[in-house]
Structures are given as C-alpha cells and as structure tokens.
C-alpha cells in the first residue's frame, strides 16, 4: 500500500465502521472505510480504516495521513496517546491532474 516515506494518500469514502467496544483512547472517534485511489482516480483493491474528525461522508474524496501525522491530526495535544495509524486530514473539493504529466509518470 503506502511505500516507505509516504505519509499521505488520496481515497474515496466507501463506508463507516461502528465499534462499541474499543480501547479508551479511541472513545468518541468516528471510523471510515477508505478505498485508496491512484492518480487516474481509479480505486485500488485495498481498503484502509481511518479515524475521522472532519465529518467526511460516503462518496467523498479525502486526503488521509499515516502514522505520526495521523495521530497529530486527531490528538494534537498528545499524539502518542491515541492508538490510530491513519486519519482523514482533508476533504477534497476538487482535484486537477495534468494528463500530460500523468502519462509521463505512467510511462
């Protein structure tokens, strides 16, 4: 999925996860099912469960962070106190990809 050094990815919200029993530091967190997308906006086969405090909805494209960046986004006062590995850090309003540049990347 994400390669070493890659802390952000784009994804489409495809659902949510409800959990009544979880560790205390996850109380009041909402969880979404994200399908990562590539630059051509095609969905990949993996899904990622992410924490969300921004209120993203099903069908929206979101920017997600991994690791420390995700924990910092969810609990900036003390990011080491929350046991998450991925989080929504932005909801995409629009995404413009230059087709010429995209073709260079693909080739």
Enumerate the language-model features and the residues they cover:
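N-terminal first-folded block
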Residues: 2-44
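OB-fold and OB-like single-stranded nucleic-acid-recognition modules
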Residues: 2-3, 10-14, 19, 52, ...
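Short, surface-exposed secondary-structure edge patches
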Residues: 23, 51-55
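Short alpha-helix capping/helix-loop boundary micro-motifs
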Residues: 45-51, 73
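Short, surface-exposed secondary-structure boundary micro-motifs
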Residues: 67-68
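C-terminal structural segments of small proteins and small subunits
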Residues: 71-107
């Amino acid at each position: 999925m994400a390669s070493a050094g890659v802390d952000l990815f784009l994804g489409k919200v495809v659902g949510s996860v409800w959990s009544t029993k979880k560790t205390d530091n996850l109380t009041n967190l909402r969880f979404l099912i994200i399908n990562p997308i590539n630059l051509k906006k095609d969905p990949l086969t993996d899904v990622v469960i992410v924490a969300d405090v921004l209120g993203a909805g099903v069908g929206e494209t979101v920017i997600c962070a991994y690791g420390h960046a995700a924990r910092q986004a969810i609990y900036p006062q003390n990011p080491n106190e929350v046991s998450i590995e991925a989080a929504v850090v932005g909801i995409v309003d629009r995404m413009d990809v230059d087709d010429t540049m995209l073709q260079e990347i693909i080739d």
